Amino acid sequence: MALHFQSLAELEVLCTHLYVGTDLTERIEAEKALLELIDSPECLSKCQLLLEQGTTSYAQLLAATCLSKLVTRINPLPIEQRIDIRNYILNYVASQPKLAPFVIQALIQVIAKLTKLGWFEVQKDEFVFREIIADVKKFLQGTVEHCIIGVIILCELTQEMNLVDYSRPSAKHRKIATSFRDTSLKDILVLACSLLKQVLAKPLNLQDQDQQSLVMQVLKLVLSCLNFDFLGSSADESADDLCTVQIPTTWRTIFLEPETLDLFFNLYHSLPPLLSQLALSCLVQFASTRRSLFSSPERAKYLGNLIKGVKRILENPQGLSDPGNYHEFCRFLARLKTNYQLGELVLVKEYAEVIGLIANFTITSLQHWEFAPNSVHYLLTLWQRMVASVPFVKSAEPHLLDTYAPEITKAFITSRLESVAIVVRDNLEDPLDDTATVFQQLEQLCTVSRCEYEKTCTLLVQLFDQNAQNYQKLLHAAPGLAVDMAIQEGRLAWLIYLVGTVVGGRLTYTSTDEHDAMDGELSCRVFQLISLMDTRLPHCTNEKIELAVLWFLDQFRKTYVGDQLQRTSKVYARMSEVLGITDDNHVLETFMTKIVTNLKYWGRCEPVISRTLQFLSDLSVGYILLKKLVKIDAVKFMLKNHTSEHFPFLGISETYNVGDFRCRTTFYTALTRLLMVDLGEDEDEFENFMLPLTVSFETVLQIFNNNFKQEEVKRMLIGLARDLRGIAFALNTKTSYTMLFDWIYPAYLPVLQRAIERWYGEPACTTPILKLLAELMQNRSQRLNFDVSSPNGILLFREASKMICTYGNQILSLGSLSKDKIYPMKLKGISICYSALKSALCGNYVSFGVFKLYGDNHFDNVLQAFVKMLLSVSHSDLLQYRKLSQSYYPLLECLTQDHMSFITNLEPPVLLYVLTSLSEGLTTLDTVVSSSCCTSLDYMVTYLFKHIAKEGKKPLRSREAMQAGQRLLHFMQQNPDVLQQMMSVLMNTIVFEDCRNQWSVSRPLLGLILLNEKYFSELRASLINSQPLPKQEVLGQCFRNLMEGVEQNLSVKNRDRFTQNLSVFRRDVAEALRSDGHTDLSSLDMMS
């Protein structure tokens, strides 16, 4: 779409396609046109045309979108133009306050971005973009509509100041945000609070939409102020339960005034739910205020006011019937315990009354289990932390938790059991299906349940016996009672979960022998129920009960089975009488019997199988447990009979989901750990263990050769690859790994190679095979350090080379792929290939020099495949997909460390691509990637420096090595900006960024400085000259100190000296730049 002839009508059609169009092609074309419009010299005039003459809100929105992108470009518009845009928008929204809300919001975002990016810019000795605060006050003096716009401007500005733009240096963002915090944020909060006081001072007309909108925007403004990232810690907002608000000390007076908290509690009681929940959100932040803001007496008084507010809300609970209010109030209660100690809470005058009200509120909430289930998390967090604090309370005041905690536990237990009948009869969504939430709530409950444990245990025993009896009656009753049976099974599932929870609670709370005996009473009943239900397999099954049983078994394992636990635990006293289980050896037998039973009868139920196998895997970690396990008959049976005949989940029927095959890796990892206990050097034992896989591979070979049943072969190979990966993962000794290698090579690796050739376009097949290859290449625990007479290392690498080359060549034939397919179809496989190659190059089990010596091209071939695959990937994709970047950059590090001859032989465009990828990787937030980039760059710079240093001297190196160095030097001379750009990036990181890998950054920086002293001098002068005169001398001294004692070489001693100097330099420069002078931050950017 050519832009030069676009009329207003054509632009409005573009808007329609962009915002409300349903045709995907038209929308993509509109997006392209939008990008062209932003780059067009006519952009501003077109935006003005749309704003002033556009007939739809979408036209105005397009103008705002274009302006937003225009003002945030890396190369900013002239300051005069930006001031004009800011003033134009202010006048525009002031003259048209009835614009669509989303248009006003979008235009105000442009003002906020302009203000943030120009915060330090000076014109005629004034910070021109800071005048926005004064401009807003004019809006606040106008109509209600103008007042709303003014508040939205302040709210957007506060949020924009708090927003980290990862495309710009984080240190610049922090400097702007800190200056805004120190100069403006407190005034904005005071202004917002005064507006709210004015609202409360006169009768509220809740029918007036404008007034409601004003109150909403002011509350959002207060919340933005309190949510500000005051310290620049960028805490993860999802970590809601651990948040402390780092209020600046200068705000103390606001927080010490009781009227401040009263204002928000009064607003909660006065406003309708949509607004009152915002008032509660503000109170959540007030309750989270850092403790150190107050002295001890002040903190006690502040806490007292918070508790009074809680009491008033709970005594007038009508507002809590709204889910939004209810959720925020639950968060508020949780934050109280996060920020205040139980010892402080019990000293509050109203504590006894309020803890009773909170307990009743919690019990009511638990009983109404279907109402706002996500909010229960916060209530359980409160009680969990209260109970966990009991041992540390030194106050004589009663905490009353021994009264209320058992009631909370009882309410949870009874409410969950009562919910089952409602869920089954009304066909509602079952809370048990959301296992993540169930596990989270149970882990919180386990601490609470151990407080006054006798009461909880008595209740559970009574309920379990009653429900078990009802279940047995139903088993012997006439058919046709399916609903009653479903209810009873659901109740039993909850009870098993709950028993597992309270048993697991032993680890979180002080326990006695009597408590252990109670655990035995409860556990007895679950083990009896397990036996009863397993006798009814396979005819009667219940997935929920099985998952609950596995939870219980895992909790019992963690609590009572292990190396460090006492063998004489009282838990076994009752279990010995009833079940004959006298110690953890007997328990392990029960565990393994249950595991084998599940694997036999639950083969097609993926949740049960995967949880069972995870339980088996957890059991198989730890030598002492393994020694006990291998003596158990059930384990011996598994080691000899791991076939689909005995364990159906190992089958390959077309009715089975290929995705479920993943669990086979877990199974074989655990099984191989068990095999390894007594394997030693017994090759016959290993051959017997591998027999089922041998049979499968021979079948595959036969079918492959006859060229039929290809779908069956593919499924078999997927399963075999996953099995072998599990086996290879567990073989961590040279002897055992050699047995596997001798088994798989040369007989079966070529089969996998053929599979890659045939099904290269099917990730379901190629991914397991490539992951197996990557595992085989891992020299974990030096397992691949074969004997000196063995060629196995080279043979393994040759096979890996063939497979990577085959995959690389075939995958490129797929051509271009859509965004949603490019990772699963192509990039995932490439990342696994790179990971495998990296393991080979760094594994130290292959002498790569022999390949060229003997004319073997496998090494060269795999490196060429690496290059071909790399060139098919864009730089943005390299960094966007984490697994790809975390395999590519460490691989490049290996290549630059040991194979610089390969790097120097790359064609100039390829070398430029590699160096550009390094440069972009240096700026990423992923420290694994950025550190790898620094190391790779250091190897390259060191190689180049050494070559230059040896020029003109008598050559000790081969002519070939000299030519390689010369090629790299010539390339750098032809492309001087490459290393200069990287030096700019590293200096920028040191001076302006939150540099988390300073040591890694320092290593290549010295070499870059020594190779580019002239450019380094220019960077130094640029930074120094951008500062006011008083700072110039300080910065000059910082740079002199940086190079003090540093010599013109890259010896380890010299590097270490430079690294030490750099640490001091970074600190001193940060201090020099810290003061809020007239510094234009854009001039400080060494990359601009």
Swiss-Prot record:
Biological process (GO), any one: intracellular protein transport
Q: In which tissues is it expressed?
A: Highly expressed in primary spermatocytes and very weakly in pancreas.
Looking at the keywords, is Transport present?
yes
Predominantly, its location class is cytoplasm
Q: What are the GO cellular component annotations?
A: cytoplasm; nuclear pore
Return the SUPFAM superfamilies for the record: ARM repeat
Location within or outside the cell: Cytoplasm; Nucleus; Nucleus, Nuclear pore complex
- The Phosphoserine modification is found at 569
Entry GO MF terms: nuclear export signal receptor activity; small GTPase binding
**Keywords assigned by UniProt?**
Acetylation, Cytoplasm, mRNA transport, Nuclear pore complex, Nucleus, Phosphoprotein, Protein transport, Translocation, Transport
Which residues are recorded with the post-translational modification N-acetylalanine? 2
User: What start and end residues bound the annotated signal peptide?
Assistant: none
Say which family it is in: Belongs to the exportin family.
Assembly:
Binds to nucleoporins and the GTP-bound form of Ran.
The task this protein performs is described as: May function as a nuclear transport receptor.
Tell me the protein's name: Ran-binding protein 17
Organism expressing this protein natively: Mus musculus
Gene field: Ranbp17
